[in-house]
Structures are given as C-alpha cells and as structure tokens.
Swiss-Prot record:
Pfam families: SnoaL. PANTHER family: ESTER CYCLASE, POLYKETIDE CYCLASE SNOAL-LIKE DOMAIN. Homotetramer. Dimer of dimers. Belongs to the polyketide cyclase DnrD family. Pathway: Antibiotic biosynthesis. InterPro entries: Cyclase_SnoaL-like, NTF2-like_dom_sf. It is an enzyme of class 5 (isomerase). This is Nogalonic acid methyl ester cyclase. The lineage of its organism: Bacteria, Bacillati, Actinomycetota, Actinomycetes, Kitasatosporales. Its EC number is 5.5.1.26. Nogalaviketone binds at residue 95. Involved in the biosynthesis of the aromatic polyketide antibiotic nogalamycin. Catalyzes the formation of nogalaviketone from nogalonic acid methyl ester (NAME), the last ring-closure step in the biosynthesis of nogalamycin. GO terms for biological process: antibiotic biosynthetic process; polyketide metabolic process. The gene is snoaL.
C-alpha cells in the first residue's frame, strides 16, 4: 500500500486490495469501493500533493486481522484540497491508518491525518467561493 502512494504505481492493486475495499473518508471525493477506488485515491493524493508526495513508515502493528500503520505524509500542495486552491507549500503530516485484512488483502481502511498541523503548514488557507461541492 505505501509503495503505491510513493511510486504512483497501481497496476498491481488487485494483488493486495480486496474487491470490497472501502475507505469511508474517500467517499466525499467521489471515490467509492474496490481496487479501482484505491487506485483513484493514490491518483488523488499525487494530484493534490504532487508527484513528490511520499509516505514514511514510522511503525506498523498487527493484531489478528487488523493492521495499524503510523505514517508521515510528505508533500507539496499543488491541487485543490477540499475547496482550497493550491498554495505550493511543502508540508509533513503524521497519520494513523487502521486496516482489516480479509483473504490476505486490505478490505477495510480508515485513516486519521493531522489536518490541523497540515493546514497550519499550508498557511491556514480558506476554501474559495467554489468550495468543494461538485
């Protein structure tokens, strides 16, 4: 999973993403379920935070079917982020990801990024009048 975000390579997502994959946080971006949804998420991250965006693994924990990943996202704000125009600023933000592995693949995925710290590094931008609604 981390490799996909770091390289942008998603042609192999069927190997590690379950057909019923869901990350509820992506629904507001029009990204739904399954391996193609994960590939869309990778594309969105790279379009919003640049091709230079990368995740660094801090710690990975496993308990039964659950995996908890402590990560840091590094990037540069180059695309629209919930209605906020690009600032071109660099940032790093800690994240926690919780995933359930089913049939050897990631099926359930939640993530909690540090929105407050990230926005502060981006200069605390506001959405423009267009907002984030389609």
């Amino acid at each position: 999973m981390v490799s996909a975000f770091n390289t942008g390579r998603t042609d192999d997502v069927d190997e590690y993403i379950h057909p019923d994959y869901l990350n509820p946080a992506t629904l507001e971006h029009g990204i739904h379920t399954g391996p193609k949804a994960f590939a869309q998420l990778v594309g969105w991250v790279r379009a919003t935070f640049s091709e230079e965006a990368r995740l660094e693994e801090v710690r990975i924990e496993e308990r039964g079917p659950w995996v908890k990943a402590y990560l840091v996202l590094y990037g540069r704000h180059v695309g629209r982020l919930v209605g906020m125009p690009p600032t071109d600023r660099r940032f790093s933000g800690e994240q926690v990801h919780l995933m359930r592995i089913v049939d050897g693949k990631i099926r359930d995925h939640r993530d909690w990024p540090d929105f407050q710290g990230t926005l502060r590094q981006l200069g605390d931008p506001w959405p423009d009048d267009e907002g984030w609604r389609p």
